[in-house]
Amino acid sequence: MTTLLIAEHDNASIKDSTNKALTAAAALGGEVHVLVAGENAKAAADAAAKLAGVKKVLLADNAAYAHDLAEPLAALIVALAPSYDAFVAPATSRFKNVMPRVAALLDVMQVSEIIKVVSPDTFERPIYAGNAIQTVKSKDAKKVITVRTSTFAAAGEGGNAAVENAASAADPGLSSFVGEEVAKSDRPELTSARIIVSGGRAMQSRENFAKYIEPLADKLGAAVGASRAAVDAGYAPNDWQVGQTGKVVAPELYVAIGISGAIQHLAGMKDSKVIVAINKDEDAPIFQVADYGLVADLYQVVPELTEAIGKLGK
């Protein structure tokens, strides 16, 4: 069995989600090859070649893959399909757009967000917002799989794979890049952060996020997250959303402030190693999954907590 892992990268380096998806790909057995598709992405390909367990790296370096458009990348993967038995990618927003297209073009079923490889054709995945585990056995000759990376350990370095150039596939021409607005931040990326501080609808405004949540996050060196209710209310940007319809995270420490704990939010963070909840409602569902809970007014205790942590750092 030969598996093609599609790498998530920034052209210069490999994202941590790729390292974790590699662990899942290796569990299928057989060789694992990595596809790096981008523009001026040689550095990312070289980084992928150093990952333990990678047999070969395919580099598709073309302007068509510069802006994460789903159609050209899906066409490339399908063009490579005759040589592979399985196609694996992290279950990130990018590949949630790409991999269903690959599955449709190959006329197979996609197995989404697996959390365990039972055998090369059998997988476990969460359903019902993580409240049940489904075992899926795929009879398709070619497997298309996305990986919930929060449940897999990251593969380390130690490899020395060859890097080969892959011919670009014909662009379907179904979409074109218009532009992008990039939000830059000195904080860690949400899905790979060790610590996350999240705010909910109780924050009441974008200004309160900036006044209470962000200073605490900065003191802890943390990423900032938000519940869907807070995002829908306009208190936080979409890329901060944690939950079933947002980003799934599993940091070492997750601090939930003013978050009631809707089932959709819990599905995105309940695998965190330590969960701390601050909420004035003692019956809030968030306390059912929290390791530590504080029933208090966030507007009083969060500034005190931020100040106390600041003093510890001096």
Region locations from a protein language model:
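N-terminal glycine-rich FAD/FM-binding segment characteristic of electron-transfer flavoproteins
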Residues: 1-314
